[in-house]
């Protein structure tokens, strides 16, 4: 009898989260199409954004409308890209990539998050030198390590990371060879469960004690901001932070 509202509330929360994800991907598709044209075959960044949309179960019609708005075939809002950098508690480096139609609002929101959670914003370039742009092809637990490793080497991947706790595998590539490696592995029958271009820290910082919750609070707060697309850090929070 008492379960109805609980189930409905969970569904509403799930729908809201899905809507926020869609909004961010649509912005990303728009910026990519406006900057490099609406043909994904000639616009690698657009191809990445479209793949992200399809992975999130976004319909092709929604993706097509986002592209048309960006290329001027349909009326739409223009967004600009902004990157903020700073430090979380414990000296953890943080990069915040945003797409916004109101720079003043966005910087105020990001600054508030850093301040509220005990961090501080830095200047441009203050932490980004600690990260590299890489492609990541993720294979979930249970994947065939030997077969994936062989396919990755043949495809020209840079590195292979196997997670001992569950056997999941990340195949790492240089940013400029991401698409080629992904397509070569798919042709070899090794399609990843998830793939993306991202930033990875050169060295992680082990975070312990009460600082774990402080850092996680900041990262979560930044992720929840409407104008924020991606948040990267060099924090190693440990498995308990996500339990």
Curated annotation (Swiss-Prot):
Keywords on record: Cytoplasm, DNA-binding, Transcription, Transcription regulation
Gene Ontology CC entries for this record: cytosol
The keyword Cytoplasm is annotated on this UniProt entry: yes
Subcellular location: Cytoplasm
NCBIfam families from the UniProt entry: PRK00110.1 (NF001030), PRK12378.1 (NF009044), YebC/PmpR family DNA-binding transcriptional regulator (TIGR01033)
Protein family per UniProt: Belongs to the TACO1 family.
UniProt protein name: Probable transcriptional regulatory protein Smal_3128
Taxonomic source organism: Stenotrophomonas maltophilia (strain R551-3)
């Amino acid at each position: 009898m008492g379960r109805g509202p609980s189930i409905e509330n969970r569904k509403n929360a799930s729908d809201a989260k899905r809507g926020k994800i869609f909004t961010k991907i649509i912005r990303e598709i728009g910026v990519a199409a406006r900057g490099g044209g609406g043909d994904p075959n000639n616009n690698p960044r657009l191809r990445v954004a479209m793949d992200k949309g399809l992975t999130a179960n976004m319909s092709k019609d929604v993706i097509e409308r986002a592209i048309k708005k960006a290329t001027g075939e349909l009326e739409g809002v223009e967004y600009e890209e902004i990157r903020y950098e700073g430090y979380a508690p414990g000296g953890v480096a943080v990069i915040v990539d945003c797409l916004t139609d109101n720079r003043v609002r966005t910087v105020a929101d990001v600054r508030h998050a850093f301040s509220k959670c005990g961090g501080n914003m830095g200047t441009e370039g203050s932490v980004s030198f600690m990260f590299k742009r890489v492609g990541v092809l993720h294979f979930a637990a249970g994947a065939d390590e030997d077969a994936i490793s062989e396919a990755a080497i043949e495809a020209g991947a840079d590195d292979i990371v196997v997670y001992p706790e569950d056997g999941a595998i990340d195949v790492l590539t240089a940013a400029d060879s991401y698409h080629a490696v992904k397509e070569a592995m798919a042709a070899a029958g090794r399609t990843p469960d998830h793939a993306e271009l991202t930033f990875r820290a050169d060295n992680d910082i082990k975070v312990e004690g009460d600082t774990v919750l402080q850092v996680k609070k900041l990262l979560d707060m930044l992720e929840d901001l409407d104008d924020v697309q991606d948040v990267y850090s060099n924090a190693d929070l440990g498995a308990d932070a996500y339990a």
